Amino acid sequence: MEQKRCISSLTLEQLSAELKALGQPGFRAKQIFHWVHQKLVSVFSAMTDQPKTLRARLEEQFYIAAPQIERRQEAKDGTVKYLLRMADGNCIETVVMRYHYGNTVCVSTQVGCRMGCRFCASTQAGRVRNLEAGEICSEIYTAQKDIGERISHIVLMGIGEPLDNFDEVMRFLENITSPEGVNIGMRNISLSTCGLVPKIDLLAEKKLQLTLSVSLHAPNNEIRSGMMPVNDAYPVEQLMQAVRRYQNTTGRRVSFEYSMVRGVNDSDACAKQLADLIRGMGAHVNLIPINPVDGSPYSATDAANVRRFQQKLESLGVNATVRRRLGSEISAACGQLRRDEMNGKA
């Protein structure tokens, strides 16, 4: 028996081709796309304006991505963290963060991660598989239905390296920004990368109006390679050249993520090196007090030291902010909920 495919992963153009092959009129594609990506149904039987025969055929060949909420944690500030179980039984994490300008969802792009960053819980068991475009969409739809409020912003900063799943992430972006779907503005989307240089160049060619957020975390190769194995393949100099090419091609400002680790990357010397590295780029730096991760040798810099580091950067002409810590009383470290579930603790 042929394995069912995820209809949520098809772009409108791809869906049109599939329906044409089934002998359906052209207008059916938009109708079905609306049901999946705008009305957010999870079963074909809910598509009441479609012929029963077509619904039956779709049921035979496709499924709609609709993960189950395995675990839900809500913090006092309204942050909600989900452990979602996908159709194949694998689990991922999704987080809703509430801000004055709207609701932001942090989505995962892979089941696990193979980048090996030593301060991150989501990479400790490696990568199991890539998520399909429709599965990434379903994280947003599940969260939106659960909280009963519109999602206005997306950050691709959950489990996985988005550019290591390039094609599916591009299809996800096409579907999630489609006027025929939930129509989230591309400028309201941030994509994070640990620094896959060839994929940054590939992304630049797309000239998308999203915000690229580079997980830098260190101002030199010695420290960065100790924290992030990807730096051995794409050292700081190559990464920064790619980021500058990206800026020149897209005209978009880039932000840098910098996780503050006690005694590793939080010195005044590091602040000066960081300022020298990004000077003239008009870039923004997000300073992140790391969350404790079981099995990691790293610990967070104290708040006073984070503030001092920020002030040092600003005195050197760098725009830097300290990331607001949302949901601090829930399992906040990225990948921690999934790892607990894998270890039988959830």
Give the positions of each predicted feature.
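Short linear Ser/Thr-Pro motifs
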Residues: 75, 108-109, 122, 192, ...
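P-loop NTP-binding catalytic core
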Residues: 88-102
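Canonical Radical SAM [4Fe-4S] cluster-binding loop centered on the CxxxCxxC motif
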Residues: 98-135
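Auxiliary Fe-S-binding modules of radical SAM enzymes
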Residues: 1-92, 244-253, 258-346
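Conserved alpha-helical substructure of the radical SAM core
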Residues: 124-153
